């Protein structure tokens, strides 16, 4: 990452951490407590984004390489899922799984928007602006489903214990396990396609970056401490460069 982009990232990533904290604290000012919020995928994905953004900011400050692109892609996908599911499924009156939106006090309403809108947009922007390009693989889209499926198992087991499910599309009490299975297949395919979209955008940005370099952007300057090839070559007694071992020219007396 260039010095200029690193400075922008150092300002951008703490803003993500602050947005996550603001969203959780403001939401907790409503009827729900912090511990009551923890079982929700929304909170878990936001916490993951906040922790990862803080870690990435620390690495940028220490001038270390960016964290794992596969892990960053996973975190970005999960917070994207949070935003997409909320706006298209839970808060959409046309959705069969729409949840009636309560009259929230202003702090809680702001917290809700931080968690479902502001943080997802900031996380996607961070991934698009600062991550190295061309490192995501198609197979990652399948691997990234591990956490949502693990979350499903957690939510179903918890539902058996407390008779309460965090989301209507995995509510076994209302849908039955057959209905939950249908929802699971549908959402798993959608999440897989979102993962593929992330990989596709990564590759598209990589090609765009390569095309810009081909149009005349100068290549990065060599390191000042990089040894020159000629300087590193051994020289013989006559001052001429000596051939590498195994490739020495035969002497005149040995020919024939």
Tell where the protein language model's regions lie, with residue ranges.
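Membrane-helix exit/interface motif
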Residues: 26-30, 53-62, 82-99, 125-129
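Membrane-interface transmembrane-helix boundary segments in multi-pass integral membrane proteins
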Residues: 160-197, 251, 256
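Alpha-helical transmembrane segments of multi-pass membrane proteins
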Residues: 16-31
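Membrane-interface loop-to-helix entry segments
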Residues: 42-45, 108-121, 181-185, 189
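Interfacial segments of alpha-helical transmembrane regions
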Residues: 63-80, 137-145
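Loop-to-helix transition at the N-terminal end of transmembrane alpha-helices
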Residues: 35-51, 70-74
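Alpha-helical transmembrane segments in multipass membrane proteins, preferentially the mid-helix core
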Residues: 120-136
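N-terminal membrane topogenic signal
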Residues: 1-16
């Amino acid at each position: 990452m260039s010095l200029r982009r690193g400075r922008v990232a150092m300002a951008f990533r703490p803003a993500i951490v602050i947005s996550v904290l603001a969203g959780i604290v403001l939401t907790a000012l409503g009827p729900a407590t912090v511990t009551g919020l923890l079982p929700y995928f929304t909170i878990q994905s936001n916490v993951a984004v906040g922790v990862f953004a803080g870690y990435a900011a620390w690495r940028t400050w220490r001038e270390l390489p960016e964290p794992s692109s596969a892990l960053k892609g996973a975190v970005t996908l999960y917070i994207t899922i949070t935003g997409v599911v909320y706006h298209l499924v839970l808060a959409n009156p046309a959705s069969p799984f729409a949840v009636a939106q309560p009259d929230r006090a202003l702090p809680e309403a702001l917290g809700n928007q931080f968690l479902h809108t502001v943080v997802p947009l900031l996380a996607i922007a961070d991934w698009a602006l600062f991550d190295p390009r061309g490192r995501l693989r198609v197979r990652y889209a399948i691997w990234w489903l591990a956490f949502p499926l693990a979350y499903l198992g957690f939510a179903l087991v918890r539902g058996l214990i407390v008779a309460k499910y965090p989301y209507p599309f995995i509510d076994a009490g209302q849908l039955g396990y057959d209905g939950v299975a249908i929802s699971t297949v549908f959402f798993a395919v959608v999440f897989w396609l979102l993962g593929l979209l992330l990989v596709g955008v990564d590759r598209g940005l990589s090609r765009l970056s390569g095309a810009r370099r081909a149009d005349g952007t100068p290549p990065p300057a060599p390191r000042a401490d990089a040894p020159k090839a000629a300087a590193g070559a051994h020289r013989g007694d006559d001052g001429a460069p000596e051939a590498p071992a195994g490739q020495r020219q035969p002497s005149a007396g040995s020919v024939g």
